[in-house]
Amino acid sequence: MTELKNDRYLRALLRQPVDVTPVWMMRQAGRYLPEYKATRAQAGDFMSLCKNAELACEVTLQPLRRYPLDAAILFSDILTVPDAMGLGLYFEAGEGPRFTSPVTCKADVDKLPIPDPEDELGYVMNAVRTIRRELKGEVPLIGFSGSPWTLATYMVEGGSSKAFTVIKKMMYADPQALHALLDKLAKSVTLYLNAQIKAGAQAVMIFDTWGGVLTGRDYQQFSLYYMHKIVDGLLRENDGRRVPVTLFTKGGGQWLEAMAETGCDALGLDWTTDIADARRRVGNKVALQGNMDPSMLYAPPARIEEEVASILAGFGHGEGHVFNLGHGIHQDVPPEHAGVFVEAVHRLSAPYHL
């Protein structure tokens, strides 16, 4: 078993005792850091940065040099899987990700390959191996993927969407086609995450960014069902240690009980969910991650500390809390404010673990 100098994050996910509440930030390697912008400029564009193992490793490590974070997260993108299926991913200035060949019908789904993670997605595994080597056992490395539903929204809409009318039209008019796509994505994501674990990821997270746009019934059928399939198929132990799995549905606060039944180890919470309420509902079954509003990092340091204290008090004493933002850090947040946040979590949480 690889010895970790700091395993707080893994211990908290398994609801084991820790000295202070562990903390990391979604999108902690990102555009709010000047050093990230410099490395991205060196790479040329975003996907070139993802596909260069040395540069992906560099940006993964950048926030850890600035802040005493308790975990590193692989620098990559959720759209690597659809890209590897041949949909032609590109980035439009001001528009975000687009696909040249969106999925429009069952025939399109049937033509999609299930990517080999060590072949078409080998660059991701190279990045995982490189990061693990360079971390030198300081903190654990988190691997991740998008959820089948969230990946499908991009693949069917042809890119980002606000109303999700194209995929909802498929969902209601041709549910068979959408289920076929989601099933293929669930198989692909299971292989992809297991390959990340074998390459060295010590925990994994499934990001269901767009699950919250569904009705409760549709969420169960079209999102949660497929995440459950993935959890069932994941390697849960590697290198002599349990590999914890976190599910995060943005806007999914009303479905925590159902999410906790999947067999995952932890649930990510966005900032619209009260953490005390979440702990009452599912804290005996899973750990909780979250959940400060990312926009709070625009506030003065004293206000950030006040919010950290409030969330810590909401969760209360005992184990099973990983502090995080409720979604990704915004690109124009002052880096010093992120530092205030991380330091406050460690300092203010100690009394909750006595």
Curated annotation (Swiss-Prot):
Metabolic or biological pathway, per its Swiss-Prot or TrEMBL entry: Porphyrin-containing compound metabolism; protoporphyrin-IX biosynthesis; coproporphyrinogen-III from 5-aminolevulinate: step 4/4
| Sites where the protein binds substrate | R27, Q28, A29, G30, R31, D77, Y154, T209, H327
**By its UniProt entry, which InterPro entries does this protein fall under?**
UROD/MetE-like_sf, Uroporphyrinogen_deCO2ase_HemE, Uroporphyrinogen_deCOase
Signal peptide: which range, if any?
none
The protein's UniProt keywords, in alphabetical order, are: Cytoplasm, Decarboxylase, Lyase, Porphyrin biosynthesis
Q: What is a single molecular function from GO for this protein?
A: uroporphyrinogen decarboxylase activity
- Give the Gene3D superfamilies listed for this entry: 3.20.20.210
Cite the CDD domains for this sequence. Answer: URO-D
Which reaction is recorded as catalysed by this protein? uroporphyrinogen III + 4 H(+) = coproporphyrinogen III + 4 CO2
Q: Is Lyase included in the keywords of this UniProt record? A: yes
> Record's SUPFAM superfamilies?
UROD/MetE-like
Task: Give its localization.
Answer: Cytoplasm
Q: Might you give the EC number(s) for this enzyme?
A: 4.1.1.37
Q: What is one Gene Ontology biological process annotated in the Swiss-Prot or TrEMBL record?
A: protoporphyrinogen IX biosynthetic process from glutamate
In chain numbering, the residues marked as site (Transition state stabilizer) are: D77
Any one Gene Ontology cellular component term annotated for this protein: cytosol
Q: How does it assemble?
A: Homodimer.
Which family does the entry's similarity section mention?
A: Belongs to the uroporphyrinogen decarboxylase family.
Q: What does this protein do?
A: Catalyzes the decarboxylation of four acetate groups of uroporphyrinogen-III to yield coproporphyrinogen-III.
This chain belongs to the protein called: Uroporphyrinogen decarboxylase
Q: Give the species.
A: Escherichia coli O7:K1 (strain IAI39 / ExPEC)
Report which gene this protein is encoded by. Answer: hemE
